[in-house]
Amino acid sequence: DVDFSELDGIILPGGMPGTLNLGAHAGVTAQVKAFAEAGKLVCAICAAPSVLGACGILNGKKATCHPGFEEKLTGASVSYDNVVTDGNVITSRGMGTVIDFGLAIVSYFGSEELVEDVRKHLVYNR
């Protein structure tokens, strides 16, 4: 068992059929909603931002997703940026954007100095 109250954020990994399974699981969607309502970090990549849309978490927020899932970002202002951070929600487009997605999560919790240190150790020069 997991004590979700001890966690600072939640990440939905995307992919298919994983995204469909996440969205259909009442326990997952309940936790995602609870994290959002508590102001905790909610992240999703690839097709998984569609789950956030279905949960009502993207209302009034800017978000991105894998090409072809834009219509599932219910309530969001759709962006085609690789990574979008809007308040406590971070979304990203897919596997090719995963390093930037990870660095956005590090940035949310840490300093820019920490982000640069992680970037350096990843040998990621972007």
Where are these regions (language model features)?
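Active-site-adjacent pocket-lining segments in enzyme domains
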Residues: 2-126
